[in-house]
Structure formats: structure tokens, C-alpha cells
UniProtKB/Swiss-Prot annotation:
Residues binding Mg(2+): 18
Originating gene: metK
Protein name, UniProt field: S-adenosylmethionine synthase
Cofactor(s) needed for function: Mg(2+); K(+)
Keyword Electron transport: no
Naturally occurring in which organism (per UniProt): Vibrio cholerae serotype O1 (strain ATCC 39315 / El Tor Inaba N16961)
Residues involved in ATP binding: 16, 165-167, 231-232, 240, 246-247, 263, 267
Recorded superkingdom: Bacteria
Summary of the function given for this chain in its UniProt record: Catalyzes the formation of S-adenosylmethionine (AdoMet) from methionine and ATP. The overall synthetic reaction is composed of two sequential steps, AdoMet formation and the subsequent tripolyphosphate hydrolysis which occurs prior to release of AdoMet from the enzyme.
Location of the protein in the cell: Cytoplasm
Length: 385
């Protein structure tokens, strides 16, 4: 490991066009799951000026009002006036949803639910590190917290000239793998025409950055780039088109761990792209919480229609406190990583997904894959005190 190095991660707000798309896709999934938890859902969304298109493959007994779900989601994000470049009440909503292919269905559905096959082939990674209290890398954790703070002060009226679209980026300094400070902070936020650049920069510093970033990591050397172009009035879907599944690094570990390439939002848990990535995080987090390693990355792989993973890999980057063999044996013994098993283990057949679609899927204790309920078992198994 390099003695001293910098590492950077970024996040985007709930009003970023790609995140609008993710939230609509997951809002549709949740609405269907409220009526039919066994539904098959693959919902993709595209947003651009004045228009939302919702498509994909859905097989369900439920009936949901796609148009109203779409408008309500955009409304909650805060795009409610044409002055912002997008209006939930007047945008067009196009629905192009079809049904899941019976060829896929026959590989997934089995007479014995425990033998449910994976919905596709693929590789998934999960990661945990003890550098933050939520066992996530610090750069992505604090990038998300900046975006959550931006939304909070926008919605509660503290900074009424803020608009929904925003991005953050935080560069941490490490020395021998330990955080020693924050080198740079980038925060760009959409705003109304009424605020000057100087006033915006001061307000963002005082109301967003300072309340979020720990003072001990900031110094006179820390660099701040607040709306560095000087103007960000045109934003949201008017500035860029948005698509479901285009923020997969923001959704996961900010680049600090590997990624299998599969996106999450709009997919029911039969899609291992989503459910197995959650399970891999759960496994990695419990290994770190148990004190078996300081850092842990899990890779899983699957074949379409086959229940058992085709491979399980554990990487602890030389930080393990017990042998790799013990860790791998513990994973096999205490975690059921078949599609049905991990759905049951993590209680995934419930409408909890819209909340995941902004500010990251990991490091947020309200989600079942963030539980560390297996840590004591693992500690005992490994003989750790």
C-alpha cells in the first residue's frame, strides 16, 4: 500500500437527472411489491426536458398507476415549477412496459422455491471497511452526507434559493491506510437566478459543508470548489437527460471497491445484480464487524437458472486477523447465498427500495443488509474474543 495517497469519491443529489430516473424505477417497484411481493419487475426510466418515459418488463397481478407514481416522485424531489426547468404537474409521462420473457421465467421459477435459479449470470461485489462507524469508505460516506444536507436545507427553507440538482466530491488524504485529513471538497448546486455567486458560496460553506465534514479533518490547506463555474441555474432534466442505472459507483462504494457492472434500481430481488450485491455487502460488513478483518471484499458469481453461486471469493487485503480459510468456511456455513436463501435472509420481498435510490444503497442502517446480526456467530466460529 502506498504510504501516503489521496482518494476521491463523488455523490449526486436526489434531483440529479439519473437519480430522478432511479427513484421513479424504484417507486414503481415498491408500489407493485405493496400488492404483489412475488412480482417480476425490471423497470427503466428516461427523463429529459418536459418528459419521463417508463419502460421495461413487469409480470405481476398488481395494478399500479405509473403516471401518478412518476409525478408524485418528481414532486417529492422538488421539481414543481417550470422555473426549475421541470414540473411534475405538467411533464409528459410515457409508459412502454411489457412482460418478462417466459424463457427467463422458466429458469428462475422452480417447484421448490429453495431451488429458485438466478435471474441472470453475472458478478457482484460487496465491501466493508472499519474506517467509518457505518463500515463504509469515508469519501463516499461524506459525499452522500453533503448531498443529504443540501436536500435538507433546500426543503426546510434554510436556503430557499437552492434547486434540486447538485453534485459533491470529497478527496481524503491517507497515510499508511489511515485518514489524516480532507484535501479537497467540490460542491456544485443548482440555484435560482436571485442569488449572487459570492452569497451562494458563503451559504453553502456555512450551511452545508461545515455542519457535515468533521473539523479535525479540515485545515487551512483544504481546498474548496463551490459552484466553480460560477452559475448553475439550468439543471435537472433540462440540463442533462437522466437514465436508470447510470450512477452505479455513487450507489455503491465510490470506487473504493470493485463493481460487477450491474445496476440496482427498478429490479426485483430475483435479479442477482441487486440482491446478491446486497448479500455480498452483508457478508463483508459482518466479517469486518466481527473483527475478522479491517477490510473485506466479497465477489459472488451466478449462472442463469442455477441456484448455487458459481463462485465465492473473499479478499481481505492483508488485514485479516484469522486465516482466509476460516473466513471462507464461515461464509459458506453462515450465509445462504442462493437467490431464495438471500431473499429470505435479508427479507428482500418488501417495498423498501425507493429510499435506496438516492444517497447510496450501503452504510444506511435502516436497510436489512446493513445488519451486523451475524458478527457474534462469526467471532465465536473464528475463536476471537
Amino acid at each position: 500500500m502506498a504510504i501516503k495517497h489521496l482518494f476521491t469519491s463523488e455523490s449526486v443529489s436526489e434531483g440529479h437527472p439519473d437519480k430522478i430516473a432511479d427513484q421513479i424505477s424504484d417507486a414503481v417497484l415498491d408500489a407493485i411489491f405493496e400488492q404483489d411481493p412475488k412480482a417480476r419487475v425490471a423497470c427503466e426510466t428516461y427523463v429529459k426536458t418536459g418528459m419521463v418515459m417508463v419502460g421495461g418488463e413487469i409480470t405481476t397481478s398488481a395494478w399500479v398507476d405509473i403516471e401518478e407514481i412518476t409525478r408524485q416522485t418528481v414532486r417529492e424531489i422538488g421539481y414543481v415549477h417550470s422555473d426549475m426547468g421541470f414540473d411534475a404537474n405538467s411533464c409528459a409521462v410515457l409508459n412502454t412496459i411489457g412482460k418478462q420473457s417466459p424463457d427467463i421465467n422458466q429458469g428462475v421459477d422452480k417447484a421448490d422455491p429453495k431451488e429458485q435459479g438466478a435471474g441472470d449470470q453475472g458478478i457482484m461485489f460487496g465491501y466493508a471497511t472499519n474506517e467509518t462507524e457505518v463500515l463504509m469508505p469515508a469519501p463516499i460516506t461524506y459525499a452522500h452526507r453533503l448531498m443529504q444536507r443540501q436536500a435538507a436545507v433546500r426543503k426546510n427553507g434554510t436556503l430557499p434559493w437552492l434547486r434540486p440538482d447538485a453534485k459533491s466530491q470529497v478527496t481524503f488524504q491517507y497515510d499508511q491506510g489511515k485518514i489524516v485529513g480532507i484535501d479537497a471538497v467540490v460542491l456544485s448546486t443548482q440555484h435560482s437566478d436571485s442569488i449572487s455567486t459570492a452569497d451562494l458560496r458563503e451559504a453553502v460553506m456555512e450551511e452545508i459543508i461545515k455542519p457535515v465534514l468533521p473539523a479535525e479533518w479540515l485545515s487551512k490547506e483544504t481546498k474548496y470548489f463551490i459552484n466553480p463555474t460560477g452559475r448553475f441555474v439550468i439543471g435537472g432534466p433540462m440540463g442533462d437527460c437522466g437514465l436508470t442505472g447510470r450512477k452505479i459507483i455513487v450507489d455503491t462504494y465510490g470506487g473504493a471497491a470493485r463493481h460487477g457492472g450491474g445496476a440496482f434500481s427498478g429490479k426485483d430481488p430475483s435479479k442477482v445484480d441487486r440482491s446478491a450485491a446486497y448479500a455480498a455487502r452483508y457478508v463483508a460488513k459482518n466479517i469486518v464487524a466481527a473483527g475478522m478483518a479491517d477490510r473485506c471484499e466479497i465477489q459472488l458469481s451466478y449462472a442463469i437458472g442455477v441456484a448455487d453461486p458459481t463462485s465465492i471469493m473473499v479478499e481481505t487485503f492483508g488485514t485479516e486477523k484469522v486465516s482466509q480459510e476460516i473466513i471462507i468456511e464461515a461464509v459458506r456455513q453462515f450465509f445462504d447465498l442462493r437467490p431464495y436463501g438471500l431473499q429470505e435472509m435479508l427479507n428482500l420481498l418488501q417495498p423498501i427500495y425507493k429510499k435506496t435510490a438516492a444517497y447510496g444503497h450501503f452504510g444506511r442502517e435502516e436497510f436489512p443488509w446493513e445488519a451486523t446480526d451475524k458478527a457474534a456467530l462469526l467471532r465465536d466460529f473464528a475463536g476471537l474474543k
